[in-house]
Curated annotation (Swiss-Prot):
Name of the protein in its database record: Mitochondrial nicotinamide adenine dinucleotide transporter 2
Catalysis: reaction(s): dAMP(in) + NAD(+)(out) = dAMP(out) + NAD(+)(in); dGMP(in) + NAD(+)(out) = dGMP(out) + NAD(+)(in); GMP(in) + NAD(+)(out) = GMP(out) + NAD(+)(in); AMP(in) + NAD(+)(out) = AMP(out) + NAD(+)(in)
Any one biological process term the GO annotation gives: NAD transmembrane transport
More info: Present with 1630 molecules/cell in log phase SD medium.
Solcar repeat residue numbers: 36-128, 136-225, 241-329
Residues that span the membrane, as ranges: 42-62, 104-124, 142-162, 198-218, 247-267, 298-318
Origin species: Saccharomyces cerevisiae (strain ATCC 204508 / S288c) (Baker's yeast)
InterPro entries: Mit_carrier, Mitochondrial_sb/sol_carrier, Mt_carrier_dom_sf, SLC25A32-like
Listed GO MF terms: NAD transmembrane transporter activity
Similarity annotation: Belongs to the mitochondrial carrier (TC 2.A.29) family.
Keyword Transmembrane helix: yes
Organism domain of life: Eukaryota
Pfam families associated with the record: Mito_carr
Amino acid sequence: MNNGDNKTTLENSKNASLANGNYAIPTKLNRLKKNADPRVAAISGALSGALSAMLVCPFDVAKTRLQAQGLQNMTHQSQHYKGFFGTFATIFKDEGAAGLYKGLQPTVLGYIPTLMIYFSVYDFCRKYSVDIFPHSPFLSNASSAITAGAISTVATNPIWVVKTRLMLQTGIGKYSTHYKGTIDTFRKIIQQEGAKALYAGLVPALLGMLNVAIQFPLYENLKIRFGYSESTDVSTDVTSSNFQKLILASMLSKMVASTVTYPHEILRTRMQLKSDLPNTVQRHLLPLIKITYRQEGFAGFYSGFATNLVRTVPAAVVTLVSFEYSKKYLTTFFQ
C-alpha cells in the first residue's frame, strides 16, 4: 500500500472514530500527558480560581440570597427578593455596592484551593483512566471528573459553609451582621454549632458530582467535535477560531450540566444556613426535599436558576479558558 492509501485509510479511520464518538487518545500523546509536570495543572487551577472568584462574587451573593429565601418562607418570614434584577437592585439599595461582594474573601479562598485540587486530580486521573477505559472517553472523563470533584468538595466544604453564612448577612433583621469576617465565622460556627456544622450540605454537594460528570465529558467531547487544537502556541491561538471553539465548548457544557443538576445547589445552600426549622428537617436531605416540594412545588428546586445561569456560565468560560491557556503557557515555561 502506498503513502497516499495509508493517508486515506488513516483519515477514514479517524472520521469513523469521530462519527461513532470514539475519541481514544493516541498512545504517544498518552505518554506525553503522563510525563506532564504536575505543577502546571495545580498553578493553572489556582489562577483560574482567583479569576473566577472575583467575577462570580456579585452573582453568587444574589443566587445565595434567592436560594435561602425559600427556606425563610418556610419559617413564615417575608419575601424580600424578587427575581434576578430585583435581587441586585435590593442588595444595592439596602447595602450598597459592598453588599454584592459580601463573602469575597472566603469565595477567593474557596475557589483557589478547590480548582487547584480539582484540576490537579482531574489531570492526574485522566492520564491513567484512558488505560482503564480505552474505548470509552466518556467513562474516562466522567470517572476523572467525579474523583476530582469528590476530593476537592470534601477538602473545601468548610470554606463554602463560611462563604454562604457571610453572603447571607444583610445588616437587617434576622440576617444582620453576626459574623465579622472569615476567621470569626469559622470560630463562631465551631463554638455555637460544633465542627460538624462546617460539613453541612456535604451530601447534596457530593450528589452534585453529577454536574462535573456531565460537564467535563461533554466539554472534552465538544472540544474534539469543534476541532479545538491543543497546540501550545498561545500568541497565535487567542486570535484564531481556536479561542472561540473553547468558549463555545465551555458555555454549552456548563449550561447543560447546570440545568440538570441545579436542585442539589438549592438543597446544599438551605442545609448550610441557619433557620428556625428543626435540625431533623434542615440538616437531613430527604425531609428537606419533602418540605421544599410541599411548600414550593417543583419550582422551589429551581429558585434563582436564571441568576445561577448568569453566574455559572461566564464563570465556567473564565475558569476553563484561563485554565487551558495558563496550562499552555506554563507547559512551555516548565519545559
